[in-house]
A protein has these predicted regions:
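Conserved Nudix-box catalytic region and its N-terminal flanking loop in Nudix hydrolases
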Residues: 2, 52-94
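Conserved hydrophobic "DFG−1" position in protein kinase catalytic cores
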Residues: 51-52, 59, 127-129, 146
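A broadly conserved sequence feature marking short terminus-proximal activation segments
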Residues: 1-8, 150-154, 163-173
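Acidic, metal-coordinating catalytic segment for phosphate/diphosphate chemistry
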Residues: 2-48
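NUDIX/MutT-family hydrolases
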Residues: 135-166
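A short coil-to-beta-strand element that immediately follows conserved catalytic motifs
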Residues: 22-23, 99-107
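Active-site-adjacent beta-strand/loop module that shapes the phosphate/pyrophosphate-binding cleft
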Residues: 109-133
Length: 173
């Protein structure tokens, strides 16, 4: 269980009254006695595309923190109202210029090494893409490239490291 505390809201976002505390399901919850709103902290969701071709994996080189200067799978946060598969398609297109052909759920992790939030849920998909020209997203990434699965560059996120380790074992079989 993560030990990061959620935001400390003082006032109700709906009616503006001062929030109190109530115990629900054995946990302290911020609560508005005026309009009966209860704050349930949530974690964000992200998707990541594991794209493998001919023993090589497609990675992007991070341009911003956290983990600036390290490599990762093309990934991004799920926006409100968006299905994780829609996020995957959007992020792959934005970060690589490629179009998703097929995606299969590979694994789900709770990220514990994101300093920006109380962790997030990372959904990894084994992803096939249509042939096309690689196009780097200069706003988010320094570079993009195909790497030998057995000799990847430095991977930043721990969950991305786990998936890369799995891929290396899978290729050895």
């Amino acid at each position: 269980m993560l030990k990061i505390k959620p935001p400390n809201y003082q006032f109700c976002p709906f009616c503006g009254k001062k929030l109190g505390i109530k115990i629900e399901e054995g946990k302290e919850r911020k609560y508005c006695s005026s309009c009966h709103w209860t704050y349930y902290p949530r974690v964000a969701q992200a998707t990541a595309a594991v794209i493998v071709r001919k023993g090589k994996v497609l990675l992007v080189h991070r341009k911003r923190e956290p983990y600036k200067g390290t490599w990762m799978f093309p990934a991004g946060f799920v926006e409100f109202g968006e299905h994780p598969l829609e996020t995957l398609k959007r992020e792959v297109k934005e970060e690589t210029g490629l179009m998703v052909k097929k995606a299969l759920l590979m694994n789900i992790f709770q990220t514990k090494d994101d300093p920006r939030s109380p962790g997030h849920i990372a959904i990894f998909y084994r992803t096939e893409v249509l042939n096309g020209q690689l196009k780097n997203d200069d706003e988010e990434n320094q570079n993009i490239g195909w790497f030998n699965i057995q000799k990847p560059p430095k991977i930043g996120w721990k969950n991305h490291q786990k998936v890369m380790k799995f891929l290396r074992k899978e290729v050895r079989k």
